[in-house]
Design a protein with these regions (language model features):
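Substrate-binding pocket helix/loop in short-chain dehydrogenase/reductase
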Residues: 17-18, 25-30, 112, 123
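Active-site loop immediately N-terminal to the catalytic Tyr-X3-Lys motif
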Residues: 19, 66-72, 94-95, 130, ...
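Active-site helix of classical SDR
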Residues: 41, 77, 85
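Residue(s) in the substrate-gating loop at a strand-loop-helix junction
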Residues: 61
Length: 166
C-alpha cells in the first residue's frame, strides 16, 4: 500500500548529570530519539513526494523546549526535532506534504510509571491543569494533524502539556 501518514514516536531516556553521563548513554538516546527520525523519514519521503501527498508527525517533548537537569541527552534529542520538522516542512510543502511536531508534557506512560509517587505529585503540582495527560490526549491531536482538517498547518509544534510550558 501507499504510506501517506508517518508518525515518528521513538523515545528513550538514560538520565544522568552530564559530568557523569557516559558516551553510551548520550549516543543511545540521540540514536533512538533523533537519528531514527532521519532514518525512518528518509525511507518514506520519496514515496510521499511521488504521490504528492503526506502527513509527517514527529513526537518531541516539553523537555525539548524547557530542558531538565539530568536530561541533556534527552532534551537535546527532542529539541533537535523542531529544526528537523521546520526544515523538512519547507522542503516538501510544494508536494502537499505537511510536517509537524507534537510536544507532550508529562503523560501517563511506561516512562512516567517509573517515577515515585512523590515525583509524580511534584510534577502535577506544577501543571496548571493539575493532572498528567493521557495517551488519548496525544492521540487526539495526532489524529487532527493527520486529517484533512490540518492541511494548511505545516512546520508547527503543538504543545500538549496541561499548561506546564507556555
Amino acid at each position: 500500500g501507499i504510506t501517506t501518514i508517518l508518525i515518528n514516536n521513538a523515545g528513550v531516556t538514560k538520565d544522568n548529570l552530564l559530568m557523569r553521563m557516559s558516551s553510551e548513554e548520550w549516543n543511545d538516546v540521540i540514536d533512538t530519539n533523533l537519528n531514527s527520525l532521519y532514518r525512518v523519514t528518509r525511507e518514506f519521503i520519496r514515496e510521499m513526494m511521488k504521490q504528492k501527498t503526506g502527513r509527517i508527525i514527529n513526537i518531541s517533548s516539553v523537555v525539548g523546549m524547557s530542558g531538565n537537569a539530568g536530561q541533556s541527552n534527552y532534551s537535546s534529542s527532542k529539541s533537535a526535532i523542531y529544526g528537523f520538522t521546520k526544515s523538512l516542512a519547507k522542503e516538501v510543502a510544494s508536494r502537499n506534504i505537511t510536517v509537524n511536531a507534537i510536544s507532550p508534557g508529562f503523560i501517563e506512560t511506561d516512562m512516567t510509571d517509573k517515577l515515585s509517587d512523590e515525583q509524580k505529585q511534584a510534577i502535577i503540582s506544577a501543571i496548571p491543569l493539575s493532572r498528567m495527560g493521557s495517551a488519548k490526549d496525544i492521540a487526539d491531536i495526532t489524529l487532527f494533524l493527520a486529517s484533512d482538517s490540518a492541511s494548511y498547518i505545516t512546520g508547527e509544534n503543538i504543545n500538549v502539556n496541561g499548561g506546564l510550558y507556555m
